[in-house]
Amino acid sequence: MIENENNNLEAIEEDKKTNPLDSILDWLESFAFAIFVVILIFTFVLRTVVVCGESMSPNFHDKDRLIISHFNLTPEKGDILVMNSFGLHETIIKRCIGTEGDKIKIDYNKNTVEVNGEVISNDYLRETMRDKPTYNQEFKVSSGVYEYIVPDGKIFVMGDNRNGSSDSRSSFVGFINEEDVLGKVIFRIYPFSELGRIESFI
């Protein structure tokens, strides 16, 4: 009887010796798996980008750090998108104003942008628009008024800082191919004071 009790005590002591190591190994295994999952996500679904310049101010500023998603992406009006601009030879960030088939009218005299006959909000804009060279001069209706129809497979984008943005109004950018869109901005990670999810709106 005493011998069995001693054996049981020895087994318990042995468990106490091995349990901490097992716990550490389990934790390391879980941590390694979590890192692997994060790597997969940032390889195939998400990526981080840094804003260069002030073309999207006052909503995004130079050096802001953002997370974009490129999983199952179909650009929609109001989305903040990161895309390749072969005219500017760089990656740019802009707001999607129109998608294929949309009719866009920009009136610098009234400081308005219309999409399919509806004036979009300008509450998020930095200042009143100033007239500037546009993508398709043949669509000029009158001084300061321009109209566009977005072709199939393309989008029309503009910076929130209308007077400090090279975008679809410019001959250097023009309409953007949907396939050149790298991702939609979904989250801001820096500055920490503005950390949070990014909503789509126009």
Annotated model-derived regions:
Residues L40-S57:
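Aromatic-capped interface at the extracytoplasmic side
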